[in-house]
Amino acid sequence: LNKRCAGIGSFCGLPGLVDCCSGRCFIVCLP
């Protein structure tokens, strides 16, 4: 799943995932 967020993006507790948009984890989350 690809999600585009406006300047929001931080690593989740899961490897290979990025936390963005309402604290949800998405693969390859673009800032």
Curated annotation (Swiss-Prot):
Disulfide bonds join C5-C21, C12-C25, C20-C29. One of its GO terms (cellular component) is extracellular region. Belongs to the conotoxin O1 superfamily. Expressed by the venom duct. It comes from Conus eburneus (Ivory cone). Keywords: Cleavage on pair of basic residues, Disulfide bond, Ion channel impairing toxin, Knottin, Neurotoxin, Secreted, Toxin, Voltage-gated sodium channel impairing toxin. It is found in: Secreted. This is Delta-conotoxin-like ErVIA.
